[in-house]
Amino acid sequence: MKVLTTALLLVTLQCSHALSPTNCDASKPLAEKVLDLINKGRRSGYTFQLLRVSDAHLDRVETATIYYLVLDVVESDCWVLSTKAQDECLPAMRTSEVVIGQCKVIATRYSNESQDLSVNGYNCTMRSVSSAYINTKDSPVLVDSFEDSEPYRKLARKALDKYKAENGDFASFRVERAERVIRMRGGERTSYFIEFSVRNCSTQHFPRHPPVFGLCRVVLTYSTEASDLETPEYTDLICEVFNTEDLKNRSDMKPHRGHEHPHCDKHLCKLSGPRDHHHTHKTHEIGCPPPPEGKDNSDRPPLQEGALPQMLPGHSGPSGTNRSHRPPHNHSCNEHPCHGQHPHGHHPHGQHPHGHHPHGQHPHGHHPHGQHPHGHHPHGQHPHGHHPHGHHPHGDHPHGHHPHGHDFLDYGPCDPPSNSQELKGQYHRGHGPPHGHSRKRGPGKGLFPFHQRQIGYVYRLPPLNVGEVLTPPEANFPIFSLPNCNRPPQPEIRPFPQTASKSCPGKFEGKFPQVSNFFEHTPPK
């Protein structure tokens, strides 16, 4: 009995000293670099900008330092696939566009060199604060932000079709999905602000680096009494297009000049008549070529640039628990190549033993979307609340919400959209392709140097109401990492800390300081 008590005491002491609280404000420079890695790895949505380091702990293991960070963020006006430099991206300029969030992140640094910083995993929850922030009884304008943007995709498609009829060089682009929808009502007018992603679907011969996809912003204005949204009184459309070479050059190690859209210079150019205004904008970026070809990640961030460890999808227990473990044995680069097959039964994207199929093909009638025969639900709720073998392939989803959208690059640039499958799983990123489609990728394959396995998720929850606060993200991270051949074996990742550092949260920075009221943490003393 004494031996058992001593052993338990030693384990308790070891765990209690595993993580050291650290100063949030002092952690800000590192947090900004971590957030930049996350932004560069995501495939849809808008880039995050740091508002505050809300909590920070660290763990030193030999030559590595592992950081456990809670970051308060706000969406910028830059789409994640934009090639703009981060310092060119602005936070929301109007309160009607403010979307805030919080991310729990685990990152590892092996030295003080920025290239030795990598992201092990992250979970973010995002919510619009427009309605809660603006809509008061005295407000002359009412603002609504719509979580479900799919009903407005038709309006975006109609606006794009009208633009394409007037501009033949844009004829091969189609609407991918509506990314953000805001309605403003006031006076005698109602306006819809719709931002939507587009891709080039032409199979014709293009110059060396054709524009492949982009982001469009359309303003549709109606009279207050208008009930037919398909006939706006005024339409204003602006598009920003990107090409594959731009995406390859998203790091700043080696300069490379982007290529211009054939009909525009690097500034905004007007391409239509006075009633319906349309513009395109070509951006530039400098960077370096990508690493060996591989699968990109979804909002996942999915992460994109930098040397990130290769991770398996997270396995989590019941909601609110953390399950981070050391690998059962050492995995060398010889045992597990950095790219390719993974022995020992680990299959992050291919076929999964024991019925686990979070990505890729779904045998035995398991479909990535829709109904699942025999009661199998690889991505939604499981009968009686049980997941196969106690593991959920994507971790716990807050309030039943799944990561937003699908991977923008899941389809090649010339693949037609699937009406039945393309957007059914709009709130669950990371699905495999529609049943019957292969995982082969189009020209967009292998554009990003982020490691191939999805290591993070972004959950978009309904807009906040007055008096509500942001729902904190879960701390569900991958079960273990595979080695990076250029670094020593990954140190053990411990459960995410449940108590806050005494020197946190840090100083809140943002254009709208009142937004801090929507976070759980109170301002620092």
Swiss-Prot record:
Keyword terms: Blood coagulation, Cleavage on pair of basic residues, Copper, Disulfide bond, Fibrinolysis, Glycoprotein, Hemostasis, Heparin-binding, Metal-binding, Phosphoprotein, Repeat, Secreted, Signal, Zinc
Domain Cystatin stretches: 19-122, 135-240
SMART domains documented for this protein: CY
UniProt-listed GO biological process terms: antimicrobial humoral immune response mediated by antimicrobial peptide; defense response to fungus; fibrinolysis; negative regulation of angiogenesis; negative regulation of blood vessel endothelial cell migration; negative regulation of cell adhesion; negative regulation of cell adhesion mediated by integrin; negative regulation of cell growth
Compositionally biased spans, kind Basic residues: 339-392, 426-443
Region (Disordered) residue spans: 275-445
Annotated stretches, region: Interaction with ATP5F1A: 41-84
Site, Cleavage: residue positions: R439, K440
Modified residue annotations for Phosphoserine: S145, S438
Compartments, record wording: Secreted
General function of this protein: Plasma glycoprotein that binds a number of ligands such as heme, heparin, heparan sulfate, thrombospondin, plasminogen, and divalent metal ions. Inhibits rosette formation. Acts as an adapter protein and implicated in regulating many processes such as immune complex and pathogen clearance, cell adhesion, angiogenesis, coagulation and fibrinolysis. Mediates clearance of necrotic cells through enhancing the phagocytosis of necrotic cells in a heparan sulfate-dependent pathway. This process can be regulated by the presence of certain HRG ligands such as heparin and zinc ions.
Subunit architecture: Interacts with THBS1 (via the TSP type I repeats); the interaction blocks the antiangiogenic effect of THBS1 with CD36. Interacts with HPSE; the interaction is enhanced at acidic pH, partially inhibits binding of HPSE to cell surface receptors and modulates its enzymatic activity. Interacts (via the HRR domain) with TMP1; the interaction partially mediates the antiangiogenic properties of HRG. Interacts with kappa and lambda light chains of IgG molecules. Interacts with ATP5F1A; the interaction occurs on the surface of T-cells and alters their cell morphology in concert with CONA.
The protein's name: Histidine-rich glycoprotein
Organism listed in the record: Rattus norvegicus (Rat)
Lineage summary: Eukaryota, Metazoa, Chordata, Craniata, Vertebrata
